[in-house]
Amino acid sequence: MAMSKIMSLTGLLASASLVAGHGYVSGVVVDGQYYGGYLVDKYAYSDNPPETIGWSTTATDLGFVDGTGYQSPDIICHKDGKPGALSAEVAAGGEIELQWTEWPESHHGPVLNYLAPCGGDCSAVDKTSLEFFKIEAKGLIDGSSPPGHWATDDLISNNNSWTVTIPASVQEGNYVLRHEIIGLHSAGQKDGAQNYPQCINIKVTGGGAATPAGTAGEALYKDTDPGILFDIYSDLSGGYPIPGPEVFSA
């Protein structure tokens, strides 16, 4: 085989590896019960996919939404996101373990979690009507040596999973949990940040009285936000400003 063909094949294989390595949330565990998510690399090609708690998406390349899509509906629950038909039941104050298929070590960045009340059955909600409040965010953990140790590194070390606690004070009801990784490996340049939003439907039981104010998905970020336009390969001693609204505090 000619050298040019070998190099071309190597490049294609490397590209395929990068795409396959992004991953997605394949399911969650609540109180020991497993709920399957939307398996985009399988169900998107099926005429009759099973009903799940996970939102469907057309992101079959396991790709991302960048700054050019921050004011489009794709940033809400990924590309062409549509509500799942089912919901996972979780007690207020309970934990949800979100299981990723995989995540590439090089894609350092924060992990963020939001809730938005559906005002009814989440399976029929208009995603553009959802208003999200942030319940958790973790970013740079150790910046002593660039590119630093990030929340994504903890996710990887925890068998590609992330556990989030549902605030005990929120009202019971139906919510969309928006779980997101922002890859910052190319974020030193405009529109280089890579957002990977993943949405699931949950039903919170036994909650309190809190009804936090929310933000529309298309207003969560700007492509010039300090935590979006950020060079992880420079001096990190100043820390990292996590983008989006402040974390809700009861």
UniProtKB/Swiss-Prot annotation:
Recount the UniProt induction comment for this entry: Expression is up-regulated on steam-exploded bagasse as carbon source compared to glucose.
Q: Where are the transmembrane segments?
A: none
Q: How is it used?
A: Lignocellulose is the most abundant polymeric composite on Earth and is a recalcitrant but promising renewable substrate for industrial biotechnology applications. Together with cellobiose dehydrogenases (CDHs) an enzymatic system capable of oxidative cellulose cleavage is formed, which increases the efficiency of cellulases and put LPMOs at focus of biofuel research.
User: Which Pfam families does the protein's record reference?
Assistant: AA9
Q: List the molecular function annotations (GO) for this entry.
A: metal ion binding; monooxygenase activity
Q: List the disulfide bonds.
A: C77-C199, C118-C122
Question: Where along the chain is Cu(2+) bound?
Answer: H22, H107, Y196
* Residue positions with a glycan: N159
**Cofactor section:** Cu(2+)
The protein's location, in the record's own words, is: Secreted
- Under Enzyme Commission nomenclature, its number is 1.14.99.56
The UniProt note on the cofactor reads as follows: Binds 1 copper ion per subunit.
Where in the sequence is the signal peptide annotated?
1-21
| Catalytic function, reaction form | [(1->4)-beta-D-glucosyl]n+m + reduced acceptor + O2 = 4-dehydro-beta-D-glucosyl-[(1->4)-beta-D-glucosyl]n-1 + [(1->4)-beta-D-glucosyl]m + acceptor + H2O
A GO CC annotation given for this chain: extracellular region
User: What keywords are assigned to this protein?
Assistant: Carbohydrate metabolism, Cellulose degradation, Copper, Disulfide bond, Glycoprotein, Metal-binding, Monooxygenase, Oxidoreductase, Polysaccharide degradation, Secreted, Signal
Q: Which GO terms describe its biological process?
A: cellulose catabolic process
Listed binding positions for O2 are H185, Q194
PANTHER family (UniProt xref) = ENDO-BETA-1,4-GLUCANASE D, PUTATIVE (AFU_ORTHOLOGUE AFUA_1G12560)-RELATED
The family note in this entry says: Belongs to the polysaccharide monooxygenase AA9 family.
- Role summary: Lytic polysaccharide monooxygenase (LPMO) that depolymerizes crystalline and amorphous polysaccharides via the oxidation of scissile alpha- or beta-(1-4)-glycosidic bonds, yielding C1 or C4 oxidation products. Catalysis by LPMOs requires the reduction of the active-site copper from Cu(II) to Cu(I) by a reducing agent and H(2)O(2) or O(2) as a cosubstrate.
Name of the protein this chain belongs to = AA9 family lytic polysaccharide monooxygenase E
The source organism is: Aspergillus tamarii
